[in-house]
Amino acid sequence: MTSQRKEHYGKINRDKVLGFTWDNKEYFGYEGDSLASALLANDVRIVGRSFKYHRPRGVMSCGVEESGALVTVGSGSRRDPNVRATTQELYSGLNASGQNAFPSVNFDFGGVNNYLSRFFAAGFYYKTFMGLPPFEWGKGTGIWMVFEKIIRKAAGMGKASREPDPDSYEHANDFCDVLV
């Protein structure tokens, strides 16, 4: 472990060391750590990127109110996006990665949006490319269809697995009481 940890503080079991993977890199933590505390102890500060300008985001709190440290846990059909690193318990073999960044959270090509921020007014993505004359459906909406895909891809959060769910459940709640 690194020197980022205080020796005799915290409610962790220092006798049980757990290995985990963050962005394809091996790290170690202790039983009782959250993913966020283990990353901070290993001197990992950037865990995600903001959705619009792709600015670096780190751990800012220690509970469920955390909005900057959303990560993807697992892989394949067991991939679980938008997990708060502060509430994810560390376990041996945990595979986690940052979200909303390409190729990684430390170097993100989407960060160029930060330099173009003066051209991106708040809410620009709602009606900017809707059509001509302004906001008239049917005329000029083809350009919106093109830009909508690009904007949604750039502004997305974690990506859910497209594979079938491998788990089985006791029963499925596949009905609704009220449909509007």
Question: What spans do the regions from the language model cover?
Answer:
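Residues forming the flavin
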Residues: 1-180
